[in-house]
Amino acid sequence: MDKSKQLFRKSKGSFRRRLPPIGSGDRIDYRNMSLISRFISEQGKILSRRVNRLTLKQQRLITIAIKQARILFSLPFLNNEKQFERTESIPRPTGPRSRNK
């Protein structure tokens, strides 16, 4: 084979297959908070199926379980614990307001 063609050939490397995040024994239920909390972001949003690496059926069941837990108040709708901090305060003018025309 030509040297120029050899440079563009892809090497066939091995890849590690990831384990599914939900085991066969795990029960998807609104009471199983340890399982549900893995699929919620820090802000309290439900993570997408691509991020979770779930099947369509599992994602649907997780979504329903999260929504049931939110309705029964075992899970908050929003996570407001994160406080926003200002790094630098901007001084505000204290005098009368001026109009820009």
UniProtKB/Swiss-Prot annotation:
Family annotation (InterPro entries): Ribosomal_bS18 (IPR001648), Ribosomal_bS18_CS (IPR018275), Ribosomal_bS18_sf (IPR036870)
Record's subcellular location: Plastid, Chloroplast
Gene3D superfamilies linked to this entry: Ribosomal protein S18
Compositionally biased intervals (Basic residues): 1-19
Gene Ontology cellular component annotations, sorted alphabetically: chloroplast; mitochondrial small ribosomal subunit
Source domain of life: Eukaryota
One of the GO biological process terms: translation
Entry keywords, A to Z: Chloroplast, Plastid, Ribonucleoprotein, Ribosomal protein, RNA-binding, rRNA-binding
PROSITE patterns noted in UniProt: RIBOSOMAL_S18 (PS00057)
Location of region: Disordered: 1-23
Keyword Lyase: no
Single GO molecular function: structural constituent of ribosome
Family: Belongs to the bacterial ribosomal protein bS18 family.
Subunit details: Part of the 30S ribosomal subunit.
Cited NCBIfam families: S18
Protein name (record): Small ribosomal subunit protein bS18c
Gene: rps18
